[in-house]
A protein has these predicted regions:
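Conserved active-site and cofactor/substrate-binding residues in soluble primary-metabolism enzymes
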Residues: 2-6, 29, 33, 60, ...
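Generic secondary-structure signature for well-ordered alpha-helical cores
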Residues: 13-17, 43, 67-74, 97, ...
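Class I SAM-dependent methyltransferase SAM-binding "motif I" and its flanking Rossmann-like core
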Residues: 31-102
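Class I S-adenosyl-L-methionine
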Residues: 1-53, 159
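A contiguous loop/helix-start segment that scaffolds small-molecule binding in enzyme catalytic cores
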Residues: 20-21, 101-190
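Short, acidic/turn-prone active-site loops that include or flank metal/cofactor-
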Residues: 1-7, 78-86, 189-190
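Cofactor-binding loop segments of dinucleotide-utilizing enzymes, especially the Rossmann-like FAD-
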Residues: 26, 82-84, 110, 142
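Short, solvent-exposed polar/charged micro-motifs at secondary-structure junctions
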Residues: 8-11, 64-66, 146-153
Length: 190
């Protein structure tokens, strides 16, 4: 995560030369991917120098993790990245508070890295003020890869020391429950 601008600029340059280009972003290019950056860079160009392009959907790690868990995203949910590289921590905290007040299921991206290891603990403490300690939580790692793992915990027993940037976390809302080792956030059909 430091070469996105250059990759987009290179793709634009090649496309301007008439070369067909595929700019690949992991997961879905529009969900924490490079689609937004590409559009921003293209908008800085004079219209006559903008190559045409299309954005194709991918499968996001939140979808893969949700499928591993069962059906935790059946009702309203939000996705929040804890990385403060591009977004100030105060803004991230406001978004977490919004998720808490709205009782959203929360999908946590970029939970912690070697350099940034305190935000996840703070986030869990924030959730514990609004949610029951027994709220079910999925911790998945390397989703979609051969080393994929999933584990389900209560909110108060998340093994923070085992979580890294290859992890994704789904924290249930007040109606999320564990049924036969699957998480479900019922929509209200039954």
């Amino acid at each position: 995560m430091t070469q996105e601008k250059q990759r987009c600029a290179d793709a634009i340059s090649l496309a301007q030369q008439g070369i067909k280009v595929a700019l690949i972003s992991s997961g879905d290019a529009g969900i924490y991917g490079m689609a937004g950056l590409l559009i921003e860079l293209l908008q800085k160009l004079d219209a006559k120098f903008r190559p045409s392009f299309a954005i194709h959907p991918g499968i996001s790690s939140l979808q893969l993790a949700a499928a591993l868990a069962g059906a935790p995203l059946m009702n309203d949910f939000c996705a929040i990245s804890l990385s403060d590289k591009l977004t100030p921590w105060e803004t991230i905290k406001e978004r977490i508070n919004g998720a808490l007040v709205g009782d959203f299921v929360a999908v946590i991206f970029n939970p912690q890295s070697n350099e940034r290891n305190w935000q996840l603990k703070t986030t869990i403490e924030m959730f514990l003020k609004y949610r029951a300690k027994t709220t079910p939580v999925l911790v998945a790692r390397q989703v979609g890869r051969d080393q994929q793992k999933k584990r389900i915990f209560n909110l108060d027993s998340i093994p923070i020391h085992e979580i890294d940037m290859l992890s994704i976390i789904i924290i249930g809302n007040s109606s999320t429950k564990l049924v036969n080792n699957f998480l479900i956030s019922p929509r209200g059909y039954l």
